[in-house]
Amino acid sequence: MTTLVSNNVSFTMLKCIGLRASALAALCALAVSALAAQRAPKPLDRSNMDTTCAPCTDFYEFADGNWLKSHTIPPDKANLGAFGMLGDQNQEIVQNIVRDDANLVRDGETKPGTNEWKIGTFYAACMDTATMEKAGFKPIKSELDIVAAAKSTDDIVKDFGGAGRRGGGGGGGGGGRGGGGLAPFGIGPQTDPRNSTVVIVSANQGGLILNREDYLGEGERAVKRRADYVEHVTRSLELIGESSNEAAADANTILNLETSIARISIPQADMRDPVANYHKMPLSDFAKMTPHIDVKRYLQQQGAKNVTDAYPVNVRAPKYFTALDSLIAATPVDAWKAYLRWHIENGAMATLSGPFRREAFRWQQVTSGVQVQQARAKQCAAATNGALGEAVGQDWVKRNFSPEAKARAAKMVDNLVSALRDRINGLDWMSQATKVQAVGKLNAFLRKVAYPDKWRDYSTLAIKPGSYYDNQRVVGEWNSERSWARVGHAPDRSEWSMTPPTVNASYSSSLNQIQFPAGILQPPFFD
């Protein structure tokens, strides 16, 4: 599916997003609009409008008609709009950074272990497709061998947390799988939704590659999507040595098992209810709920420390885990072995040899409508930014966003907070007790503008020349270890969840904070 979205509509969308998260966040966004560092299209350009169209008849055509007529979606993209166009502009700077650092590494002009060296080394490994061709699927061979050796479902379940960690590599989109495991559920650190001063463990449903509706739907689209998926899995399994008949049989087994998982999964609309999805309990109670899953072992495999029976876990979907436990017991071991083989391969395809990458892109064409694969340099620049985001971001803001602009933005946000405080205190319909609560929340409101005051320390991240797969695995494990180390402690409210070049903004209700990366503080959104 491809989509055209003009600057005019995207600007409106951004304001809606801001208002949904926080009225103050939207006001802040508008206030910093004067801080854009470079020229770009106007937020509202009348030349994009088709004024021959009556706005009350077709407002979309009225607002964007001429823009839609004058723009086409590039063959390497699924959509086109202001977010993506500004993102491309930001990514050009990222590409320059990673290429420059790779040249420094090549010429021996940067010291090993520095951020520049790690950026350049990671990027160079991603660009080194010759090494990937020689390796084939050898990087995941040890993982596949462990699955092949399993004799029982117990053997499979015991390794749910280990599969994808020991040698688990890069995700299908270029992001690291290392550290995530390949279980049909997700367990990881999360700020306690009812106590934002501590990080606990959250357990959630998972294990699906398609949308739940694609597995269960009876319509033409869902039926076709399942057929396309079976073809993709079949072709992929053939690449790791299965015969065409074996691969086809395994692909159907995998679809059937994932469909069973989809049936017991809670619909996403229901998963949005914060009250219905809060079930905090000690690990011992969670273990009783899932006797066929060694959850304590899983946590330890994932990197959790000091795991005891009292370890706090928020089980977001108890009914799912109860049903999953029964499904695990009832499903033959060979079905689980096929499932894990496929998920191990799928998680690593972007980091393996050409046939794997080409099949991954063919599937992307089927699901997104993209016609041409992005240039390798663009893919690797994005992957490097994903792996070393704040190291890249530190250089990005040096080139593209001044400290003075950040200071002015922060000052404007402070002024808006003061204005909102005055407005709250002046409301005649609000009780004094409520005003005290509202001002208290406002005073605790954390504003993150442009980029972090303190950059992430990558000194313990061991990037090495050579294998792109290994580097993605190391990044995934490093991030996982950092996250698990926070359990039982207060969340680090100074840490950002987005990198400086990101074209986005967010509000966290649990942490009461906004983020406006420098990447979005530019035209056409802010001028």
Regions found by a protein language model. Give the residues of each.
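Active-site-surrounding "flap" and adjacent substrate/cofactor-binding loops of secreted or lumenal enzymes
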Residues: 53-58, 62-131
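Structural recognition of the beta-strand scaffold that forms the well-ordered cores
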Residues: 58-62, 200-202, 513-517
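Intrinsically disordered, low-complexity linker/terminal regions across diverse proteins
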Residues: 87, 254, 260, 288-293, ...
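Short N-terminal segments immediately surrounding and downstream of signal-peptide cleavage
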Residues: 38-54
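Bacterial Sec-dependent signal peptides at the C-terminal "C-region" and cleavage site
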Residues: 33-40, 177
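Bacterial N-terminal signal peptides that target proteins for export
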Residues: 5-25
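Short, solvent-exposed loop/turn elements at domain surfaces
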Residues: 67-71, 210-211, 524
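Noncatalytic, helix-rich "gating/capping" subdomain that lines the substrate-entry/channel surface
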Residues: 101-411, 415
